[in-house]
């Protein structure tokens, strides 16, 4: 799947444009 944030599965895009794990 492709998300707007461009992060890998299980990751969330933060306000500063980085990808952080949500687990």
From Swiss-Prot:
GO terms for molecular function: cytokine activity. Pfam families: GBP_PSP. Disulfide bonds join 7-19. GO terms for cellular component: extracellular space. Keywords: Cytokine, Disulfide bond. Hemolymph. Causes rapid, rigid paralysis when injected into Lepidopteran larvae. The physiological role may be to reduce hemolymph loss following injury and promote wound healing. Belongs to the GBP/PSP1/paralytic peptide family. This is Paralytic peptide 1.
């Amino acid at each position: 799947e492709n998300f707007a944030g461009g992060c890998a599965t299980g990751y969330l895009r933060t306000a500063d444009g980085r990808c952080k794990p949500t687990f």
